[in-house]
Amino acid sequence: MRDFQSRFADRYNQITNSYSYSSSRQGLITGMVNVGSFFGCLLSSPVADKIGKRLSIIVWTTVYLIGIIIQVTTVPSWVQILVAKIWTGLSIGALSVITPGYQSEVAPAIMRGAIVTTYQLFITLGIFIAACINMGTHKYSHGTTAQWRISIGINLLWGIITLVGIIFLPESPRYLIAIGKDDEALKIMCYNNDLPLEHEIIQTEYHTIKSDCDAELAGGPARWPEIFNANIRYRTFLGMAVMMFQQLTGANYYFYYGTQVFRGTGMDSPYLAALIPDAVNCGCTFGAIFVLEFFGRRSPLIVGGIWQYICFFIYAAVGDRALYHKNGTSNHRAGAVMIVFSCLFIFSFSQTWAPAAYVIVGESYPVRYRSKCAAVATSANWFWNFLISFFTPFITNSIGFKYGYIFASCNLTGAAIIFLFVHETKGRTLEEINTMYASNLKPWMPHPEGYREFGREQNNATLKSHIGLNGETTELIENTDNQGDSGSFQTSTPDDSRPEQNQASATYIRPDKREPRL
């Protein structure tokens, strides 16, 4: 957009009467929002733990609105744009952690995966709407700030919708139980599930959350160094790796620099060319809801990584070898091939890596560490997002479309990481997931039924310890000693001669509790 360039670009060509950016300024303007998002992720955990996720969303949305206002009112100072982007990024990063967590805690268990996937769906919808707005405003007459102020200012609408909408939504039941408001939490759970209080689903979920909160209260809030202790370190680094490779798939190479990328393919309207993959991205994300619920998490990530490797390799090869004729003109057929494989890449990404990475992170951590581990994992995502957005202009100026070979190899590596290290979490309870990661089972090996049964026994024992079974109390006792490679489940019956110990107890002796070392 010429008016935006005339205000913030650092290069002017008198011959062509055009403005352009140096690689450093373009990288900074594009990438500084990710710097703010990185720190916003880390700030999200203490704020949410203190005031709850619902109120946190209100606070961070207000921060977001202030950042947009600063951008819209910018005078010809690119430094103000950078500061405003960092400020806005703080809220975006925090909300990228809090919002999926809020969704997973409020949603009925049977719909949890699908509802969390809508987070990514609305991200893609926002990208598509932004592309449409850019398409409509870039032809505004030169000299008017409407070209870019409308594109930025429209974001105020989404912030206001979020701010008003969250007022009518309930607080997370988990947070309410943690602060002792159990009755209010139960009312919300009954309303969200459309079930009566005495229903087994409500009682099971309530007592599971209650036991989790009691355990967290007994151990105290997790401190940041604890997420790198031996018992959780494996999953902490694994979550960071999954979110890192979500960025290294190269999707944002298209979304950030789509107009520049497709201008090189010979398209007359680069804005229209960039709109095509955005539309594919938005439309195909609807399929992710069914893909993740039907095929799980591991398989879509592995297949998606391989698919995306093939697409990026062909894209890079055509761009490097066939896009330009010897006289320097564009080969439009080669350009069309590149756009097709860009769309095929996004078709896969929008249904696999885009939503599944967030679902994996949301399902993999024990309750006590969840908020901090999710914050660190998501901050890794924003950190690599910044590196890609900042260095892409330098790299493309140096090696052109060969850049795609790097992303192709990263897609293949990401698929290998998922195959080797990530367990399937679909349909498993938190206790089952903890058991899988604490055992020596390999993710690609069949899981013995005993490990799933142990997770169920833990849930049942937790429930019985609260509501009683035939007038008695059942208590689960976990043996923390290493008992070898196999596990067993032992029970003891009440001793009538000792009334003070007249309770049933169950002890599960399981494999090595330590998580695999990286």
Swiss-Prot record:
Coiled-coil regions, chain positions: none
Cytoplasmic side, ranges: 1-27, 76-77, 134-149, 258-271, 320-333, 396-402
The UniProt record lists the keyword Membrane: yes
Annotated InterPro entries: MFS_dom (IPR020846), MFS_sugar_transport-like (IPR005828), MFS_Sugar_Transporters (IPR050360), MFS_trans_sf (IPR036259), Sugar/inositol_transpt (IPR003663), Sugar_transporter_CS (IPR005829)
Extracellular side: 49-54, 99-112, 171-236, 293-298, 355-374, 424-518
Localization in the cell: Membrane
Organism this protein belongs to: Schizosaccharomyces pombe (strain 972 / ATCC 24843)
Chain residue ranges for the region called Disordered: 477-518
The entry's keywords: Membrane, Sugar transport, Transmembrane, Transmembrane helix, Transport
Main location: membrane
SUPFAM superfamilies xref list: MFS general substrate transporter (SSF103473)
GO biological process, one term: carbohydrate transport
Composition skew (Polar residues), residue ranges: 477-506
Any GO CC annotation of this UniProt entry: plasma membrane
Spans traversing the lipid bilayer: 28-48, 55-75, 78-98, 113-133, 150-170, 237-257, 272-292, 299-319, 334-354, 375-395, 403-423
Protein family per UniProt: Belongs to the major facilitator superfamily. Sugar transporter (TC 2.A.1.1) family.
The protein's name: Probable high-affinity hexose transporter ght7
